[in-house]
Design a protein with these regions (language model features):
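Short glycine-aromatic motifs
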Residues: 21, 25-36, 108-122
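Surface-exposed polar/charged interaction patches
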Residues: 22-26, 92, 108-111, 172-176, ...
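Amphipathic, interaction-prone secondary-structure segments
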Residues: 24-80
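Amphipathic alpha-helical segments
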Residues: 7-32, 163-167
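Long, solvent-exposed, polar/charged low-complexity segments
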Residues: 2-8, 12, 144-187
Length: 187
């Protein structure tokens, strides 16, 4: 007898299938799927092994600088994962003050993503070459939703529904005028 409900997801593959089903049902296309297995950790993770999956989705008719990236992980501690809307933004010099931009992105996330879930936002900056002008740094935002263990434990249908709701929230984010104003022009 196990401690898991009969419909609980306890391994990586059913979690991949449920998330993928939810995102595809929302109209996005699978761009890629990568699975990895890691062994022989040292230190804190000594004796552990993990299996991870990365799924990438795009819209056929959508902007090319937008994707949904999904990270799923199976460890001896259980399953976990997150879904992220990844959006390229204007160059750093055109974004304005970082604190203001990050605050705006946080407000957009809070207003759009499903309530009751952890929804971190990250703003990444990258210089193409170390000596480049910092003002020309590429900027990218990731609006994330962490998949709750309780939802994973609730099974396939719960994950599909959360994945669909998250994609719909991501699409609302993409329609927000405040986000569009700091995205590169289309074309």
């Amino acid at each position: 007898m196990t401690d898991f409900p009969s419909n609980s997801i306890v391994t990586l593959e059913p979690l991949i299938e449920a998330v993928q089903e939810g995102v595809l049902a929302a109209g996005w296309q699978l761009s890629g799927l990568q699975k990895t297995t890691s062994h022989q950790f040292e230190g804190r993770w000594d004796g552990e092994s993990t299996r991870s999956a990365y799924l990438f989705f795009h819209l056929d008719a959508g902007p090319q600088d937008v994707s949904i990236d999904v990270y799923l992980d199976e460890t001896s501690r259980g399953l976990m994962g997150n879904m992220a809307l990844v959006v390229d933004l204007l160059e750093l010099q055109d974004l304005g003050r970082m604190q203001t931009s990050l605050g705006l992105l946080g407000e957009l996330s809070e207003a759009s993503l499903p309530e009751g879930h952890r929804t971190p936002v990250s703003l990444r900056l990258r210089l193409r070459e170390a000596g480049d002008d910092p003002g020309a740094a590429e900027a990218q935002v990731r609006f994330k939703l962490q998949l709750p263990r309780a939802t994973i434990g609730a099974g396939h249908v719960a994950i599909v529904e959360l994945a669909q709701a998250t994609v719909q929230a991501f699409e609302r984010l993409l329609e927000a005028e405040a986000l569009r104003a700091i995205m590169p022009p289309v074309g």
